[in-house]
């Protein structure tokens, strides 16, 4: 049989990685299918721990490497929950680094395949809103609108978590404002404001109040074309850091 690996302390992470990788090699060489499956499952969690540690330390490159290994192992092990976590974190890390195509790939995989498996409404809201930002940056405003509207419809029917819907309303209002559709912008920012007020989150409420004021001013005086608050990415980053993964 393949060797077993039982690290005794957190400091033994490197040894655990080496041991589980060796365990996988032995199992693979001898076609021990049950041991291979167990090794992949163990590596899934070990790689996840390494990636999360690197992300916390601020080493984006090392974190992405760890999450990539974690994702590969999770897919081989059939662990949909950890695979979803890896897609979400990789998407957010790429987004933070400005790598929109990579962020789009991982966040779309999370939204389409992983959100249901993970069952984390906060992460689901952040992923939808961040993916919409990626689509907007690539010029696909229509795709961004469709994504956000579908998310709001789903969230409104199935969730009491409202930070995600608040950010989605903010994103939709921003898109409509940029397109010159002042009435729709006001409608979305009013909804954003109502949700923000119910949440009692001062940072989100300040953004909602400012954006609604700008949109109403634009509706009354079309020549008043001020920009709405541009700190949505920061709000997304702030909220993502609180996603319960």
Outline where the language-model segments fall.
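Amphipathic alpha-helical segments of tetratricopeptide repeats
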Residues: 22-32, 68-75, 79, 108-117, ...
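Residue signature of alpha-solenoid helical repeat architecture, marking inter-repeat boundaries
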Residues: 34, 38-41, 81, 122, ...
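Alpha-helical linker/edge segments of TPR/alpha-solenoid repeat scaffolds
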Residues: 44-54, 133, 137-139, 143, ...
């Amino acid at each position: 049989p393949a060797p077993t690996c039982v690290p005794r302390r957190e400091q033994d992470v490197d040894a655990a990685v080496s041991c589980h990788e060796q365990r996988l090699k032995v199992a693979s060489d001898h076609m021990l299918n049950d041991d291979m499956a167990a090794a992949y499952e163990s590596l899934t969690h070990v790689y996840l721990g390494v990636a999360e540690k690197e992300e916390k330390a601020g080493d984006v490159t090392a974190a992405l490497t760890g999450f990539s290994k974690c994702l590969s192992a999770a897919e081989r092990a059939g662990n949909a929950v950890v695979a979803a976590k890896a897609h979400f974190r990789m998407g957010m890390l790429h987004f933070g680094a400005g790598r929109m195509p990579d962020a789009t790939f991982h966040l779309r995989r999370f939204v389409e395949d992983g959100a249901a498996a993970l069952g984390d409404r906060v992460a689901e809201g952040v992923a939808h809103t961040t993916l919409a930002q990626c689509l907007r940056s690539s010029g696909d405003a229509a795709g961004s609108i469709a994504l956000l509207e579908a998310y709001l419809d789903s969230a409104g029917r199935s969730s009491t978590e409202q930070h995600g819907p608040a950010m989605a309303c903010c994103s939709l209002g921003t898109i409509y404002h940029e397109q010159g559709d002042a009435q729709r912008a006001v409608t979305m920012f009013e909804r954003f404001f109502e949700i923000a007020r119910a949440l009692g989150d001062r940072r989100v409420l300040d953004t909602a109040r400012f954006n609604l004021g700008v949109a109403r001013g634009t509706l009354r005086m079309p020549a008043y074309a001020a920009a709405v608050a541009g700190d949505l990415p920061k709000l997304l980053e702030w909220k993502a850091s609180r996603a319960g993964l």
